[in-house]
Design a protein with these regions (language model features):
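Bacterial N-terminal signal peptides that target proteins for export
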Residues: 1-12, 21
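Carbohydrate-interacting regions of secretory-pathway proteins
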Residues: 23-245
Length: 245
């Protein structure tokens, strides 16, 4: 009797385990079906993936404006690039964005003039408010939270990953926007930045305090991408963005 009970018990256990395994497999399979990630085709050599908004591919400045007027910076079609036109002011996107992944390439002038903040200065402002500094920081001293890759006036880069003047460089930026709350407070955001593929900002907090000389102030759900005219002929190319919210 004891032996029989043991057999039954083992059989029951085996059946229960089998049912449990089937249920788990079915649940896992359903989860995969429900949550299948969208297919995105990567770009070649840093070009835009299939789900990105192309902001600049070298052919035109249609996505950009200077204030309320047409874009005034110089289009260099032969190089698929654009260049800061001194004195015309910032260039900004017509579209506005919240949380994003941004890819942008830039080059400071190969002919070196000036020093410190006067050498190859421009900047990439998320929402026109929070500047990731563009500067020739190759053998060029300045204050640390103002060098290339700094969250300007807030946080120095973790390392100096600068290429020499005139060379093309990349920023890949994950920006989580500070979010204005109903009670008037601001939920902090963050910057994660790769400079030439090297991590230089790692979830750096953004409390809502704008960078000095920002185009706009105050936290906002969405704002334009803004490129700075700091009087130096800095070039940009291959700019694309993916919306994350
Ligand atoms: Mg700047």
């Amino acid at each position: 009797m004891k032996k029989k009970f043991g057999k039954l018990s083992l059989t029951t256990l085996a059946v229960l385990m089998s049912i449990s395994a089937h249920l788990q497999a079915a649940e896992s399979s359903d989860k995969k079906k429900d949550q299948a990630p969208p297919i995105v085709t990567p770009g070649e050599n840093g070009s835009a993936p299939s789900d990105a908004i192309v902001l600049f591919d070298g052919s035109n400045l249609d996505e950009w404006q200077s204030g309320d007027a047409a874009a005034k910076w110089t289009l260099l079609k032969a190089e698929s690039a654009m260049e800061v036109k001194k004195g015309t002011g910032v260039l900004q996107t017509k579209k506005t964005f919240g949380d994003v992944q941004l890819h942008i390439e830039w080059a400071t002038p190969s002919e070196v003039t000036g020093s410190g903040q006067g050498r190859g200065n421009s900047g990439v402002y998320l929402q026109g408010r929070y500047e990731i500094q563009v500067l020739d920081s190759f053998n060029n001293e300045t204050y640390y939270n103002g060098q290339a890759g700094a969250f300007y006036n807030n946080a120095a880069p973790l390392v100096n990953a600068s290429r020499p003047p005139g060379k093309w460089q990349t920023y890949d930026i994950i920006f989580v926007a500070p979010k204005p709350q109903e009670d008037g407070s601001v939920k902090p955001g963050s910057f994660t930045v790769l400079h030439n593929g090297i991590l230089i900002q790692h979830q750096t907090p953004i409390t809502g305090k704008a960078s000095t000389a920002a185009a706009y102030s105050g936290a906002t759900p969405k704002g334009p991408l803004v490129l700075q005219d700091h009087g130096n002929p800095v070039r940009y190319r291959n700019i694309w963005i993916r919306e994350l919210n």
